[in-house]
């Protein structure tokens, strides 16, 4: 009896094994589900936000801004240097021109002494003695006058002008007051007497005129 039961059990084992073996269709479906799960995970992984590095356009814009700032600073420095150079050129040119104009001041002052002597010489000659009866004195006087006129022409040619301000308003930049005195019929503050004429060189007072000024009585 026992041996019969054993034989029946051996015969039933293959059938039971087949009943528990999964079918190919089920295996294929499981494989597809597994693959779909992996693909879904990969898709979800691709959808995760990522931090991108700075783009090339942004870098180029930053470099452009830096270069523009450097260019602006360089242009400002260039303009300042150009302005400084122009100012220096103008100052140098002005100094050269002033040296040309006023470099002869010392020489002119020496010539003024000669002009003063000529003026005093012509003024010292008695006018009543200048006649044909005294030809030597007349010739000498006329020679002095011609020399004085000629030297004044030379002065004018080189920008040296004579100041004889008799009757003019007193100007402290051109006149030097030796005294103040009331003068009848004269306006106070005007020049009543010129003791020594003055001179201007190219508009600048070289020697002030020595004068007497009218004051209120």
Curated annotation (Swiss-Prot):
Subcellular location per the Swiss-Prot or TrEMBL entry: Mitochondrion matrix
Matches recorded under Gene3D superfamilies: 3.90.20.20, Head domain of nucleotide exchange factor GrpE (2.30.22.10)
Keyword NAD: no
GO cellular component, one term: mitochondrial matrix
Signal peptide: none
Transit peptide, from-to: 1-27
UniProt keywords, alphabetically: Acetylation, Chaperone, Mitochondrion, Transit peptide
GO molecular function: adenyl-nucleotide exchange factor activity; protein homodimerization activity; protein-folding chaperone binding; unfolded protein binding
GO terms, biological process: protein folding
Region (Disordered): 37-56
Pfam name, any one: GrpE
Modified positions (N6-succinyllysine) in chain numbering: 94, 120, 215
Modified residues (N6-acetyllysine): 94, 100, 215
HAMAP family: GrpE
Record note on quaternary structure: Probable component of the PAM complex at least composed of a mitochondrial HSP70 protein, GRPEL1 or GRPEL2, TIMM44, TIMM16/PAM16 and TIMM14/DNAJC19. Binds to HSP70, HSC70 and HSJ1B.
Described function: Essential component of the PAM complex, a complex required for the translocation of transit peptide-containing proteins from the inner membrane into the mitochondrial matrix in an ATP-dependent manner. Seems to control the nucleotide-dependent binding of mitochondrial HSP70 to substrate proteins.
Family designation: Belongs to the GrpE family.
Stated name of the protein: GrpE protein homolog 1, mitochondrial
Lineage: Eukaryota, Metazoa, Chordata, Craniata, Vertebrata
């Amino acid at each position: 009896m026992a041996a019969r039961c054993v034989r029946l059990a051996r015969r039933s084992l293959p059938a039971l094994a087949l009943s528990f073996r999964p079918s190919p269709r089920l295996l294929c479906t499981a494989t597809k589900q597994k693959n779909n799960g992996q693909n879904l995970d990969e898709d979800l992984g691709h959808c995760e936000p990522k931090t991108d590095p700075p783009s090339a356009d942004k870098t180029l814009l930053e470099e452009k801004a830096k270069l523009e700032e450097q260019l602006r600073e360089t242009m400002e420095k260039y303009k300042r240097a150009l302005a400084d150079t122009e100012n220096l050129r103008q100052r140098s040119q002005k100094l050269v021109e002033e040296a040309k104009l006023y470099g002869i001041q010392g020489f002119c002052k020496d010539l003024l002494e000669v002009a003063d002597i000529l003026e005093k010489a012509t003024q010292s000659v008695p006018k009543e003695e200048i006649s044909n009866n005294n030809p030597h004195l007349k010739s000498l006087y006329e020679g002095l006058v011609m020399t004085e006129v000629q030297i004044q022409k030379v002065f004018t040619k080189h920008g040296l002008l004579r100041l004889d301000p008799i009757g003019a308003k007193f100007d402290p930049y051109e006149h030097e007051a030796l005294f103040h005195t009331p003068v009848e019929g004269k306006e106070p503050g005007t020049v009543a007497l010129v003791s020594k004429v003055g001179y201007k060189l190219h508009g600048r007072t070289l020697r002030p005129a020595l004068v007497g000024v009218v004051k209120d009585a």
